Amino acid sequence: MPETSSLLPYTDTKPVGAADFYAAVNATFRFILHEQGLEGLRRYWLDLGRKYFAPVTRRWSEGGLQAVAEHWRAFFAAEPGAEVEVTHGAEEVVLEVRTCPAIAYLRAHGREIVPCFCQHCHFVSAAMGEGAGVEVRVQGGNGSCTQRFALAGHFVQPQQMEDIATAT
């Protein structure tokens, strides 16, 4: 993928993406889960983080937590309906997701949400951070959550899947 000046791994002429994409994402997760099981879906998320988001990983590696904060600000600015506060502290970047745009869209349009949907935030972000020495912990989900990013070794405990809510 060619390098761009964008903080995101893609370029778009629109300031905000199309929300109907969330239905396609949910359907993709459902299909992979049905065909390959939970471990197959988690492998997909890890591949997405490692491969598709590789340009972001490079920026994080070069720019540290400042680059992490910049990425998430740009990411959520392009997400329709997102209500997210990104704070960059001395040791952590914290995302307070008050309204997850994907969950809000899927609910508003009567879609059955894949129960493990919110786990993708952990697996994709963890894979993005691997090559940059950045770790993530996710707490909550099902429409709102807290995501904490820090340099590797900062968190004492590994991510607990039970800390990530089941989506409904």
List where the protein language model places each region:
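N-terminal accessory segment detector
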Residues: 1-94, 99-119, 127, 131, ...
